[in-house]
């Protein structure tokens, strides 16, 4: 009987630690997604500004540089680590960055996982970075990443030979892509919120 009680106490303590860890990771994911929203909104504002017909090619190039900086910040946020050093969007306990940039293109190389935090209760402690950042409709029936959207905007706005029509088309495509990307991140945050509510019920 004493052994059974000790085992139950040990199991309860382990579950308590697992719940605490899962909560921390999910809160860090929520913070990262919130920062991503801010960065994408800032980029959207710049794209709108770049669409002003009175701007010169030099003005647009300057805006493109700002958008590029925001894009790089977004990549850093997407590779956020949790308190244990694992990547929040990188899969269960991953020590490998989930978002990898090669020759200017960003790819996602992770497999999100779940963790049991209570008897028969599992929550996602590694969020699906692909769904959040890499699955934006491209307007032609395919998918692209939010990084692709920003890269295309930077390229178009940096082109000194771009015509007014080119700029208009590029800014519209960027706004559409960023709006879709913001919706994806918002959905990811909703998922995190649901997981946190599940943890509240376990506690």
Task: Tell what function each PLM region has.
Residues 1-94, 155-203:
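Amphipathic alpha-helical polymerization modules
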Residues 44-150:
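Amphipathic alpha-helical coiled-coil/heptad-repeat segments
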């Amino acid at each position: 009987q004493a052994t059974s009680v000790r085992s139950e106490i040990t199991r309860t303590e382990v579950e308590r630690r697992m719940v605490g860890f899962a909560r921390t990771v999910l809160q860090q994911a929520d913070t990262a997604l919130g920062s991503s929203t801010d960065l994408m909104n800032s980029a959207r504002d710049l794209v709108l500004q770049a669409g002003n017909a009175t701007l010169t090619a030099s003005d647009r190039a300057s805006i493109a540089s700002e958008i590029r900086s925001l894009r790089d910040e977004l990549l850093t946020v997407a590779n956020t680590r949790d308190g244990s050093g694992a990547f929040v969007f990188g899969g269960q306990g991953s020590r490998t960055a989930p978002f990898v940039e090669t020759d200017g293109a960003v790819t996602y190389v992770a497999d999100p996982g779940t963790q049991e935090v209570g008897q028969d209760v599992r929550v996602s402690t590694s969020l699906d970075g692909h769904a959040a950042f890499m699955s934006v409709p491209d307007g032609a029936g395919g998918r692209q990443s939010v990084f692709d959207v920003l890269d295309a905007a930077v390229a178009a706005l940096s082109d000194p030979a771009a015509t007014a029509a080119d700029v208009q088309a590029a800014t519209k495509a960027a706004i559409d892509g960023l709006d879709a990307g913001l919706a994806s991140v918002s959905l990811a945050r909703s998922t995190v919120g649901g997981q946190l509510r599940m943890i509240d019920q376990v506690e």
